[in-house]
A protein has these predicted regions:
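An exposed, glycine/acidic-rich loop-and-rim segment of catalytic or binding clefts
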Residues: 1-262
Length: 262
């Protein structure tokens, strides 16, 4: 696992916490109290900080042949977050459905912020060297709205319609079809790196969020979540590092669908 532990891409297919995505200037106010976090992404805190959940050793317990439970206790003040947070994460492989199910539970003894997600990077074409681009992947996202970002990838506070913009994946489009358009949001993110506001049947329901089809292999991945949003990230900042089996990963050679709050 050296390629994971020593990876220059620290969030490669890891569990993200306490808080997935960026917190502006590493600060937030909760019930009138300001909390300062570790800065690790320009002026911001990203994915829980440099030693967030992705960098922690979790306790593991195999509950069944296809089920593993992980537990971690994040101490009060870790990376600046308040409260002792007990986290339980279960990975379950459903062979008949050809599905990987990830479940999270967290409890705290003090008011805090939590936004857990999985930062899986996918290339459905399979392993080769260099890893092929994901720009030919055909993506559909069940979302009529998204959250625009500024030049340092912080949400502006708006919730904008995707209709009539390159952000619209309500019908199938390849990733590369519009990714280089002179559209300010794609310039800000160096590609797609945005939260999509999912069309939910009801709050907390398990719904289809996104579909990704790789035409050369014929592989399709469906993403379901109970969360309100999903972050589409097209590997814009991958820099050619070496991963498993000697494969290298240049920019836009992997795609992420990060289920999350927003």
């Amino acid at each position: 696992i050296d390629h994971v532990v020593n990876s220059p891409e620290p969030f490669l297919s890891t569990t993200i916490g306490r808080y997935g995505n960026r917190i502006a200037k590493g600060k937030f106010t909760l019930y009138g109290e300001e909390h300062e976090l570790t800065i690790n992404n320009g002026p911001n805190s990203l994915h829980g900080g440099p030693t967030g959940f992705h960098a922690r050793v979790w306790d593991a317990d195999q509950l069944a042949e296809n089920i593993i439970q992980f537990n971690y206790v994040s101490a009060d003040g870790e990376e600046g977050f308040p409260g002792n947070l007990e986290v339980e994460m279960v990975y379950r492989l459903e062979e008949e459905e050809n599905a990987l199910v990830i479940e999270y539970r967290a409890t705290t003894d003090k008011a805090t912020v939590v936004n857990l997600t999985n930062h899986g990077f996918f290339n459905l074409a399979g392993i080769s060297n260099p890893t092929p681009t994901i720009e030919n992947n055909i993506v559909t996202i069940n979302a009529n709205f998204y959250t625009p970002i500024d030049e340092v990838s912080i949400p502006t506070g708006e919730v904008a319609k995707v209709e009539g913009t390159p952000m619209d994946f309500t019908t199938p489009h390849t990733v590369g079809e519009r990714i280089n358009d002179k559209f300010q949001q794609l310039i800000n993110g160096a590609g797609y790196d945005h939260c999509y506001v999912l069309n939910k049947i009801e709050t907390g329901s398990l719904d289809l969020a996104a579909t990704c089809f790789e035409p050369n292999s014929g592989r399709t991945m469906e993403v379901y979540t109970t969360e309100a949003g999903v972050q589409l990230y097209t590997g814009n900042w991958l820099n050619g590092f070496e991963g498993a089996h000697g494969a290298t990963f240049p920019a836009r050679s992997a795609i992420c669908f990060e289920a999350q709050c927003f």
